[in-house]
Amino acid sequence: MAAGKYGTIVADPPWHYPFGHPAREHKKHPYPTMTIGQLCELPVSDWADQSAHLYLWTTNEHLRYAFGVLGAWGFTFKNVITWCKPGLGMGGTFRNSTELVLLGERGKHELKRRDVGTWHVWPKAQENSRKPDAFLDLVESVSHGPYLEMFARRNRIGWDTWGNESLEHIDYTFGWTAAA
């Protein structure tokens, strides 16, 4: 793939959760995960155009690390989008009912529109970790392509996808193995 191709990248990393907590001992990761170091080593800055947006999904538990990943990939933090989910999820302190998306910018990547709020109530997806289709609709309405979705769970017309759960994907090999 040519360097500097994508104007917008969406990433939903397989954050590693240490399930050593007694409440989580019965759980297993439903997919291979990556450590913070492995995520930071991905050459995302090579894939992004000189002017680009990055939408980086994170959980409350990984928020402090997500800023470092965003920076390692060559982006500057600009804003956060909050997905307010119906119902309660898991959580050690509070039961999480939100997920966060950090918006990073590289260069000066103009927005198509500026009338978008920072919180959204989208339906909860049926599959584990799947994000709402309405989110990618929002991204397309705000940011310019070409588009790449990293760690994709499905294919989308007009997007390149990379991930072990999409039907067709760009085959990048980095030599990493799932986190223990």
Predicted regions and their residues:
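Class I S-adenosyl-L-methionine-dependent methyltransferase catalytic core
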Residues: M1-A180
